[in-house]
């Protein structure tokens, strides 16, 4: 999954991310307490260059975050607008990708680094609460925000993350353009709230709230989307049958489309090209982890797109109207997380095929 795919696996969709226990950390833990004498240098011929990603082993859990940073607003705190988890099996031959609702009601742990005391609120806020830097109100830290979001998602799912990525809206647009766009099946007519047919942003409504002007429309059927179109399509939730849950599905489908395109070009197995793509994203992509991003991409590059299983976790609102507090997963969704943690995901989905996104 190039970058997992470029960390979207990365991604995001993104936003391909930042990490906790990575392969390097695991190796350090295995060797803790052991002292080994350094080998005596030999004048023999140099050893062959190891294959990239040779030390990357499964299973792997990757956290993929797409953030809205509102770069036009100085000091705007990043929000986790898209939160996806990719679980790669032990043999690196199958992966499951699922989304968590941005409004999922969760327990966000205390995070002293940002002065946050903890509380129960929407998942999207973990990124912004964690990004706050005491004494620097206009200088939010995306890395800090990711750390708190990662801890929150880990606590909710029971999964420990090996790597991840945070990508901004503009970064995702650049990523799609860097591979020449993606081919995608649009599963329902989608009207853009944000863009005009020519790609320009719609004007804010004079009365405040919402936008005015012509709207881009994505007709149902097979489509080729460039960067701004893919980003715009992935952002829409209003007016869709399924609302935010439909948007989650569209984001997952885009990641698979990215993966398909990257693999068709052999990108994951071209370390130099991967580095060029990542370099072009600049600070719109935040990644940290044990394995280098090129190693992660190479190790997962042999995973066929049809072995990336998209999983839709159904949810429902908690409270209504002015009493609305957020979303919660239905029991069938929570039980999938348990099955995933216990290594029973394949059988669980065989028993609950309605959770698998078909295309």
What are the residue ranges of the model-derived segments?
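Non-catalytic, solvent-exposed segments at the cell envelope interface
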Residues: 2-4, 13-359
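Hydrophobic helical h-region of N-terminal Sec-dependent signal peptides
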Residues: 7-8
């Amino acid at each position: 999954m190039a970058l997992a795919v470029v960390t979207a696996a990365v991604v995001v969709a993104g936003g391909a991310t930042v990490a906790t226990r990575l392969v390097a950390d695991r190796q350090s833990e295995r060797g803790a307490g052991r002292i080994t004498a350094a080998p005596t240098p030999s004048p023999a011929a140099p050893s062959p260059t190891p294959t990239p990603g040779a030390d990357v082993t499964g299973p792997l859990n990757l956290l993929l975050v797409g953030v809205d940073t509102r770069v036009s607003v100085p000091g705007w705190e990043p929000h986790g607008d898209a939160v996806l988890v990719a679980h790669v099996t032990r043999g690196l031959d199958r992966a499951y990708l699922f989304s968590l609702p941005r409004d999922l009601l969760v327990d966000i742990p205390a995070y002293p680094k940002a002065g946050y005391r903890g509380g129960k609120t929407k998942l999207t806020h973990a990124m912004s609460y964690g990004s706050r830097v005491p004494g620097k109100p206009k200088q939010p830290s995306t890395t800090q925000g990711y750390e708190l979001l990662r801890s929150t998602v880990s606590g909710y799912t029971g999964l420990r993350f090996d790597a991840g990525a945070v990508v901004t809206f503009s970064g995702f647009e650049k990523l799609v353009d860097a591979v020449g766009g993606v081919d995608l099946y649009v599963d329902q007519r989608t009207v853009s709230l944000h863009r005009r047919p020519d790609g320009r942003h719609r004007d804010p409504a004079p009365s405040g709230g919402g936008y005015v002007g012509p709207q881009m429309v994505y007709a149902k059927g097979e489509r080729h989307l460039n960067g701004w179109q893919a980003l715009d399509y992935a952002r829409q939730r209003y007016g869709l049958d399924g609302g935010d849950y439909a948007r989650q599905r569209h984001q997952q489908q885009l990641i698979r489309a990215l993966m398909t395109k990257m693999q068709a070009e052999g990108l994951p197995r071209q370390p130099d090209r991967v580095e060029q793509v990542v370099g072009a994203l600049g600070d719109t992509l935040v990644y940290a982890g044990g394995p280098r991003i090129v190693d992660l991409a190479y190790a997962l590059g042999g995973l066929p797109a049809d072995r990336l299983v998209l999983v839709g976790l159904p949810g429902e609102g908690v409270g209504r109207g002015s009493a609305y507090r957020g979303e919660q997963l239905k029991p069938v969704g929570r039980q999938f997380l348990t099955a995933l943690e216990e290594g029973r995901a394949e059988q669980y989905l065989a028993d609950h095929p309605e959770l698998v996104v078909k295309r």
